[in-house]
A protein has these predicted regions:
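Short beta-strand elements in bilobed, periplasmic/extracellular small-molecule ligand-binding domains
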Residues: 45-48, 66-89, 189
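Flexible loop/hinge segments that line or gate small-molecule binding clefts
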Residues: 1-25, 142-150, 154-155
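Solvent-exposed loop/turn segments at secondary-structure junctions
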Residues: 3-6, 24, 40, 52-56, ...
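Hinge/cleft segment of the Venus flytrap/periplasmic-binding protein
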Residues: 49, 57, 72, 161-210
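Short, solvent-exposed amphipathic alpha-helices that sit
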Residues: 26-33, 56-76, 91, 95, ...
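Hydrophobic alpha-helical
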Residues: 65, 83-148
């Protein structure tokens, strides 16, 4: 679900589209919403654990997060997700504990990675944090993420609605083949999940509809 804007522009009339989350916009929106909900003040510290170093469109989601926090006047502590943690989120536990221990005033943590987002309960408890002590925001619903929301560790998640990401591209191909339609361009990341609506979303996340 990473866009290819140059190819899309060139081949849109032939059915080339994009169904997913515009990465920069999704990152910016998540951080902006976290700023409001956590009542962040200028000068407060935030920890962004991201993939800026990947570059390209994927790296833009982290850039969006960083830009929103910078605009809010936050003190940003950034940590690139290393290869080991990217492959196995549990491998990042020591990194998280180290960052939080060195920066005890962190108010918001953003994990720009679905696997890390699903693991925030493990990270928080390893760092000695109680539920709600730090505001966690991240990307992608999963059963573990839903449980972390229910437990009070995960506060805010952008839901990318993976059913739409799988269904609509196939529909796009069929419509292009049958009717010559141009490519669809659809943002599937329009919803936030939190404790107020997680009970409705969790069963759908378990079967990868949400």
């Amino acid at each position: 679900n990473t866009s290819l804007p140059d190819s899309q522009k060139k081949y849109a009339s032939n059915g080339f589209g994009y169904v997913g989350a515009p990465n920069y916009a999704a990152g910016y929106a998540l951080a902006e919403e976290a700023v409001k909900r956590a009542k962040l003040q200028a000068g407060d510290s935030v920890f962004v654990w991201g993939l800026k170093g990947q570059g390209g469109d994927r790296g833009q989601r982290t850039v969006g997060v960083l830009d929103a926090f910078t605009k809010a006047g936050a003190k940003v502590i950034y940590q690139e997700i290393d290869a080991a943690t990217n492959a196995d989120p549990n491998a990042g536990t020591a990194t998280f504990v180290g960052v939080m221990g060195a920066n005890p005033g962190i108010k918001i943590v953003v994990t720009d990675h679905g696997g890390l987002t699903s693991n925030v309960g493990v990270y928080a408890q390893a760092a000695g944090l109680k539920a709600g002590q730090v505001y966690f925001a991240g990307f992608d619903m999963s059963p573990n993420t839903a449980q972390a929301v229910k437990d009070g560790f995960q506060n805010l998640v952008i839901d990318q609605q993976p059913f739409l990401q799988g269904y609509l591209p196939i529909l796009n191909i069929c419509l292009t083949k049958k009717y010559g339609f141009s490519g669809l361009d659809i943002n599937t990341a329009g919803a936030f999940v939190d404790k107020a609506n997680v009970d409705a979303v969790a069963p759908l996340a378990a079967v990868e509809i949400r």
